[in-house]
């Protein structure tokens, strides 16, 4: 029998160019590619820059109208961008701008999370309230936020009738979305929310960690203007 086909080589690691640009270390220069070791080059300690570099994937969901924007294990990105700043919030905001998403600095944030994540989303909701965002939530999340002293307005779920959260998105009443959930109904509602967010270019987070990062980015934009430097300036 003929020999089995040779599998294709793995794709090149995408973290290398980002690490090289952010760290400016000799570790990725030609000496290493020619076989020199890190010890031979005098690099025996970890390089820790005095700034933050954040890589963001560029996802072309706007080209595929029926594809859910919820991420899975398969690769969906078509490129990458990087934001650099002296603090996390500024770097994150720059990375989002590079990926084509402008974070809002005022307006209303919609929050709807599953029960197990309600305590974790509380600090995020509190921070948005402190920077003068209004908060809109579905019934369960709304009740939890109210019990913990965070003002909010309840809105109908997609599956419960109209006017609902998707109508609010279409009418320009929501500028930011935090939505997690489980179960068939939550998944169906979440799909319609995510597609509406994509259509109207509204930032959204499907995880608590993503919501925290975006909140820090928004806070940074409100506190001060983003400064711009060349990569060479950061590496001096």
Where on the chain are the PLM-derived regions?
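Single conserved hydrophobic/aromatic residue that forms the stacking wall/gate
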Residues: 1-24, 28
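ATP-dependent carboxylate/acyl-activation modules
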Residues: 22-154, 158-183, 187-203, 211-214, ...
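Extended, alpha-helix-rich binding/interface surfaces that flank or overlap catalytic cores
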Residues: 207
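Histidine/acidic-residue-rich catalytic or RNA/ligand-binding cores of hydrolases
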Residues: 218
